[in-house]
UniProtKB/Swiss-Prot annotation:
Subunit field text: Interacts with host coagulation factor XII (F12) (inactive and activated) (via fibronectin type II domain). Interacts with host high molecular weight kininogen (KNG1) (via amino acids 421-466 and 459-513).
Residues of this chain annotated as glycosylated in UniProt: N57
This protein's name: Haemaphysalin
Originating organism: Haemaphysalis longicornis
InterPro entries: Kunitz_BPTI_sf
Disulfide linkage: C90-C145, C116-C141
Record SUPFAM superfamilies: BPTI-like
Origin superkingdom: Eukaryota
Regulation: Zn(2+) modulates binding to host coagulation factor XII (F12) and high molecular weight kininogen (KNG1).
Coarse class of the protein's main subcellular location: secreted
Function: Anticoagulant protein. Inhibits activation of host plasma kallikrein-kinin system by interfering with reciprocal activation between coagulation factor XII (F12) and prekallikrein (KLKB1) without affecting their amidolytic activities.
Keywords: Blood coagulation cascade inhibiting toxin, Disulfide bond, Glycoprotein, Hemostasis impairing toxin, Protease inhibitor, Secreted, Serine protease inhibitor, Signal, Toxin
């Protein structure tokens, strides 16, 4: 979650302001808040739920889900992981271990961009470490680091829009 702050600039051509966001570490108590998806529009009936992140204590992973309660969720997968699972391999620096001869494509998770990116590295012996941010395949990286998504169910239409 980011807290907005307004900065005012005085220039030769006039005055203007802009809103900037300061990153803050969420309250660890949010890691225990049950994930409950919105089942339609928010309380006033007009606002759509926001797609935010919650922490699943069983899987030890973050989940993206629609919610009307912004204060009870994390703004990003990165903040969710940093708050609830600091030891996640998805937050670790990429593996730099022992190399063999040859080059291979591996994948690293970029928590700021919330995506798995390919990297060319010298080939490792057999597999990558289960504690480091380096994966043998994009699928393995996504399964480990990308948040799962809980769909919103539209009761009136009987559909899952998104």
């Amino acid at each position: 979650m980011h807290l907005p702050a307004t900065i005012v600039f005085f220039t030769c051509t006039g005055v203007f302001s802009t809103t900037v966001f300061a990153k803050y570490r969420a309250n660890p108590a949010l890691c225990k808040v049950p994930i409950k998806s919105a089942t339609g529009n928010c309380r006033n009936g007009n606002d759509l739920p926001s797609w935010l992140y919650g922490y699943n204590n069983i899987t030890k992973k973050c989940v993206q889900y629609p919610t009307c309660f912004k204060r009870l969720a994390f703004e990003s997968n990165e903040i969710c992981l940093e708050t609830c699972n600091k030891q996640s391999r998805c937050l670790q620096p990429p593996e730099t271990g022992i190399f063999d001869i040859g080059w291979s494509t591996y994948y690293v998770y970029n928590s700021r961009k919330n995506m798995c990116k390919p990297v060319k590295k010298m080939k490792f012996r057999k597999t990558t470490s289960k504690q480091k941010n380096l994966f043998n395949s994009e699928e393995e990286c996504q399964q480990e680091c990308m948040p799962s998504t809980t769909p919103i169910y539209n009761v009136a239409q009987g559909t899952y829009p998104r």
